[in-house]
Amino acid sequence: MVKTEIPDAGRKLPPLSPAVFYILFALAEGEKHGYAIMKEAETVSGGQFTMGPGTLYTTIQRLLELGLIEETSTSSDSERRRRCYRLSGSGSQVFEAELNRMESLVRSAQRRKLVPRDGG
């Protein structure tokens, strides 16, 4: 497959889909296998976001092709082989850019008094 180029970190990217965001979020803390990514997405979203294996692995394949994540050496858990994944340098930049975009939206909403500020 042809690898799609990721824009430079300084360029604006469209908002990430929830599946992409939560996969990158889960991998920001370190290498994980697919099931651990699914569980982490559910945990960090407070149960608001769940994804099935079809969505997970289709999205993982796309992120691999884009170079946002990398497959690491396969781990062996009790004779079961699992593929593990980690963020690439580009993936870290894209995840950080998305967090900055979200933070900017929250600040804008607070300035417009659409949501309360922290602690008040």
Residue ranges and their predicted role:
Residues 1-18, 98:
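Intrinsically disordered, low-complexity serine/threonine- and proline-rich regulatory segments
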Residues 56-63:
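Basic amphipathic alpha-helical segments that dock to polyanions
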Residues 93-120:
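Amphipathic alpha-helical dimerization/coiled-coil segments
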Residues 11-55:
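N-terminal helix-turn-helix DNA-binding core of bacterial DNA-binding proteins
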Residues 64-81, 86:
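Beta-hairpin "wing" of winged helix-turn-helix
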Residues 87-91:
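Accessory beta->alpha helical hairpin/"wing" motif in late/C-terminal subdomains of nucleic-acid enzymes
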